[in-house]
């Protein structure tokens, strides 16, 4: 059973994007009756809004290039801080995303919730630890989704500096230092 899902939510209208699913014909035959129970009718006005906005493949690709130009400095701010402050200590791991809107950060196991609690105390609000897991339950308490798209670069630099400090403090507490 393989299902692939995608959405235009961050590309077009946050929280109002169009979603798509790709799967085999057998999986689709199983899933359609389940979806039909949940969906009375699709938001055709929203679909039309997307067709008019995205227009065609070339226009959509050009739009994504404009998004990349806006987001690139924000992602660099996050990744540069992680590379400088966290990488030498070996207390976290992350991948350099190729596209997308998030950096998935894996803290030392057992420290993600504490690190984010410290961030909140310092005035930095982030998506909850383990938010990418089903029901928000990360059995390792390590995953933090960093979403650098909203704040201006200057605010983001301040926030990621606080984040790095809080990750360090949570790791020290976990190690009993």
Regions found by a protein language model. Name each.
Residues 39-40, 121-127, 164-172:
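A common structural junction motif
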Residues 137-177:
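PLP-dependent enzyme catalytic core of the Aspartate aminotransferase-like
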Residues 2, 92, 124:
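Short, conserved active-site loop motifs that form the nucleotide-linked donor/cofactor pocket
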Residues 28, 32, 102-145, 153:
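Conserved C-terminal alpha-helix-loop-beta "cap" of PLP-dependent enzymes
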Residues 6, 20-22, 96, 102-106, ...:
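Short beta-strand segments
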Residues 65-79, 91-106:
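Conserved glycine-rich beta-strand-loop-beta hairpin in the small C-terminal domain of fold type I
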Residues 1-68, 72, 172:
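Conserved core segment of the aminotransferase class I/II
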């Amino acid at each position: 059973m393989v299902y692939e899902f995608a959405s235009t939510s961050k590309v077009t209208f946050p929280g109002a994007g169009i979603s798509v699913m790709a799967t085999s014909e057998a999986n689709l035959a199983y899933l359609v009756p389940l979806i039909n129970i949940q969906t009375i009718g699709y938001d055709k006005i929203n679909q039309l809004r997307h067709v008019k906005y995205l227009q065609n493949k070339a226009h959509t690709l050009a739009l994504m290039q404009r998004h990349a130009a806006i987001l690139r400095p924000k992602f660099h701010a996050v990744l540069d801080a992680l590379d400088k402050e966290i990488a030498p200590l070996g207390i976290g791991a992350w991948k350099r995303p190729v596209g997308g809107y998030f950096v998935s950060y894996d803290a030392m196991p057992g420290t993600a919730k504490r690190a984010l609690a410290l961030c909140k105390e310092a005035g930095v609000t982030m998506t909850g630890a383990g938010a990418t897991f089903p029901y928000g339950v990360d059995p390792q308490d390590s995953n933090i989704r960093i979403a650098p798209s909203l704040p201006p670069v200057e605010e983001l630099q301040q926030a990621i500096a606080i984040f790095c400090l809080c990750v360090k403090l949570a790791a020290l507490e976990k190690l009993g230092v």
